[in-house]
From Swiss-Prot:
Belongs to the universal ribosomal protein uL15 family. Residues 1-57 are annotated as: Disordered. GO terms for molecular function: rRNA binding; structural constituent of ribosome. GO terms for cellular component: cytosolic large ribosomal subunit. This is Large ribosomal subunit protein uL15. SUPFAM superfamilies: Ribosomal proteins L15p and L18e (SSF52080). Binds to the 23S rRNA. The lineage of its organism: Bacteria, Pseudomonadati, Campylobacterota, Epsilonproteobacteria, Campylobacterales. Part of the 50S ribosomal subunit. It comes from the Bacteria.
Length: 133
């Protein structure tokens, strides 16, 4: 068997539809475009989403929502997890050792009444405390 001897399976290929090549072809004269009108003219190209003058679906539906491109920090209440107060230095790695957090967390915010006292222990720029600048 040689590659040049291969043929497509029976019925898998179809002849190209030749438009505007005489009445005998079944697609002559108006070439399947009907009689007159904008769509019958040469160069006509319908805009994406055009619905024949009816208000397009994209304009009928209301605008919805907003998505911020800034990532929200993972919030931890220091009052609920006492082990964070006892850490010598605070970073994402040390917090992960005492509190279960996802690997996808890249920013942490500590909240609570005693959170401000921990500000001096923070050694990671991705960990912040509420109420401090």
């Amino acid at each position: 068997m040689a590659l040049e001897k291969l043929t497509p399976a029976a019925g898998s290929t179809h002849a190209t539809k030749r438009i505007g090549r005489g009445q005998g072809s079944g697609n002559g004269k108006t070439a399947g475009k009907g009689n007159k009108g904008q769509r019958a003219r040469k160069g006509y190209n319908e805009k994406r989403g055009f619905e024949g003058g009816q208000q397009p679906l994209q304009r009928r539906l209301p605008k919805v929502g907003f998505a911020s491109k800034f990532e929200k920090p993972y919030v931890i209440n220091v009052e609920k997890i006492a082990a964070i107060k006892e850490l010598a230095e605070i970073s994402i790695a040390t917090i992960a050792s005492v509190h279960k957090i996802s690997k996808s967390v890249t920013k942490i915010k500590l909240i609570g009444a005693s959170a401000k006292a921990l500000a001096s222990k923070i050694k990671d720029e991705n960990v912040s405390v509420s109420g401090t600048k």
